[in-house]
């Protein structure tokens, strides 16, 4: 993609300032709750109080907030005022607070730099989310589409960091973009893979439900063309981003030795959900949701699938079903 072709239509001074102010309000209220900052209460009228907090460089934050349950707060974005004894702050408002705290709390430059990246990614997503639908419109949406209207984790301030995505990946794969995708499939040799399921569900059962006879025949034909036997492999869906950024770079030896074989795309289309790695089938809602490992960092964790939890999942499912059926 040439830089002149980059979709930048959502970015303008007004939308950026609005997203910044909303994120700054969230940062202030969450940092108050966590006692990261301890602002002085100037006055209170009913449920609304005015607060002031000053960092070590003389940047002062004055704002209004409502006390909520469990010692939490709700800061009014439009009430926030920043003043500086030295000069007008030169950074965007959310980044200004991060810099203030990084210096006040002795945060390392590498940590501060990483957080700045997460906050900027979050701001970009927040700008894209500004033209959300009305409550009436949301009420008529099914949950697969509704997740594309959500703003992320309600308490974590850098809740859409998605470290690993470039802007092109964001436009293609972020849930708020509501871009349907098709899943790619690979064949993985049974000597390096294992299949785990409920006792009543076999691998062939899953494949026959999730893939059409036409697709299964095409996959077998692809393996046969390379003098490989379909019976020696498991078919596994993969995300395109994971394939390009993780599987090929880290498992090239397996690919070279036919232990991993790319097969192509499935026919069905999917919507990504808030977790990034979970997908809902929009072609056939009777089919399973699909959760795929994606090695991006979002809301404090990498979105992989830890093997020990994945392997034990069928047993947990069986146990919960047993409780339900009592």
Question: Can you say where each PLM-predicted feature lies in the sequence?
Answer:
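Nucleotide/phosphate-binding site architecture used for ATP/NTP-dependent chemistry
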Residues: 2-326
């Amino acid at each position: 993609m040439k830089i002149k072709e980059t979709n930048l239509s959502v970015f303008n001074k007004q939308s950026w300032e609005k997203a910044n102010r909303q994120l700054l309000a969230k940062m202030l209220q969450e940092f108050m709750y966590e006692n990261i900052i301890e602002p002085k209460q100037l006055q209170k009228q009913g449920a609304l109080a005015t607060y002031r907090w000053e960092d070590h460089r003389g940047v002062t934050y004055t704002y209004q907030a409502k006390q909520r349950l469990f010692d939490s707060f709700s800061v009014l974005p439009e009430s926030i005022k920043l003043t500086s004894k030295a000069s007008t702050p030169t950074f965007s408002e959310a980044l200004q607070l991060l810099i203030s705290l990084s210096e006040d709390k002795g945060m390392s430059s590498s940590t501060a730099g990483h957080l700045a990246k997460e906050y900027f990614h979050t701001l970009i997503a927040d700008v894209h989310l500004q033209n959300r639908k009305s409550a009436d419109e949301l009420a008529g949406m099914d949950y697969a589409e509704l997740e594309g209207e959500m703003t992320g984790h309600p308490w974590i301030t850098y809740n859409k960091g998605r470290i690993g995505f470039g802007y092109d990946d964001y436009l293609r794969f972020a849930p708020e973009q509501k871009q349907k995708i098709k899943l790619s499939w690979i064949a993985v040799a049974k000597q390096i893979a294992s299949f785990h399921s409920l006792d009543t569900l076999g691998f062939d059962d899953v494949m026959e439900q999730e893939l059409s006879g036409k697709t299964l025949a095409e996959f077998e034909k692809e393996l046969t063309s390379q003098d490989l036997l379909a019976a020696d492999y498991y078919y596994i869906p993969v995300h395109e981003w994971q394939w390009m950024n993780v599987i090929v770079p880290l498992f090239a030896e397996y690919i070279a030795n036919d232990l991993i074989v790319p097969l192509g795309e499935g026919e069905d289309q999917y919507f990504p959900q808030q977790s990034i790695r979970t997908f809902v089938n929009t072609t056939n809602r009777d089919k399973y949701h699909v959760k795929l490992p994606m090695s991006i960092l979002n809301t404090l964790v990498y979105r992989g699938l830890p093997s020990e939890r994945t392997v034990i999942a069928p047993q947990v499912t069986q146990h919960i079903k047993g409780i339900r059926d009592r």
